[in-house]
Amino acid sequence: MGDPRKPRKKWSPPGHPWVKERLIEEMKLMGEYGLRNKREIWIAAAMLRRYRHRARELLALPAEVREKEEKALLKRLYDLGLVDENATLDDVLSLTVRDLLERRLQTVVYKKGLAKSIYHARQLVTHGHIAINGRRVTSPGYIVRRDEEELIGYAPTSPYFKKAQQ
C-alpha cells in the first residue's frame, strides 16, 4: 500500500514582503480578477514559473533531443489556452501571470457574460451554479482548457439554468 504522500504547497511567497511596486501590481490584479487573497496570484505565478523553467531547460538541450519534449510542452500550453497553435519556446518565456489568470473559471464565466461582475462570477462558481459539460465545478481557480471553453454554462439544477431556458 505504501505511505501517503505529504501534501506540499503549490506556491511560494515573494522573497521580500514589502516591495511597493509588487504590492501595487498585486492589488491591481486582485481587483481586476476578483481574487480573494494574494495567495491566488502566487499560485498562478508558481505554475507559470514551472512552465517557464521547463522552457529554459529545453532551450539548453540540443535540437534533436528537445524536439519531442518541446512539442509536448507547447501542446499542453495550447490545450490550456495559454499560447497559439504555432507558438515557440520564446512565447512560453513571455507568458505573464495575467495570461494565466485569464484562463481561470471565474474570469471565463465573467467574460462569457454569465455573471454581472467578476465578483458575481466567483459567487456563481462557489455556490455551484456553473457547470462544464453538465458537470458542476465549484473552484473559481479551475484553469479552463481550450476545448472546455464553449461547454461552460449554468448547472442543470441551478435556478439560473431555468431562467436561461425561458
UniProtKB/Swiss-Prot annotation:
SMART domains in the cross-refs: Ribosomal_S4 (SM01390), S4 (SM00363)
Q: Which UniProt keywords apply?
A: Ribonucleoprotein, Ribosomal protein, RNA-binding, rRNA-binding
UniProt-listed Pfam families? Ribosomal_S4, S4
Q: Which GO terms describe its molecular function?
A: rRNA binding; structural constituent of ribosome
Give every S4 RNA-binding domain span. 103-165
Q: How does it assemble?
A: Part of the 30S ribosomal subunit. Contacts protein S5. The interaction surface between S4 and S5 is involved in control of translational fidelity.
Q: Which InterPro entries match?
A: Ribosomal_uS4 (IPR022801), Ribosomal_uS4_arc (IPR022802), Ribosomal_uS4_CS (IPR018079), Ribosomal_uS4_euk/arc (IPR005710), Ribosomal_uS4_N (IPR001912), S4_RNA-bd (IPR002942), S4_RNA-bd_sf (IPR036986)
Its recorded name reads Small ribosomal subunit protein uS4
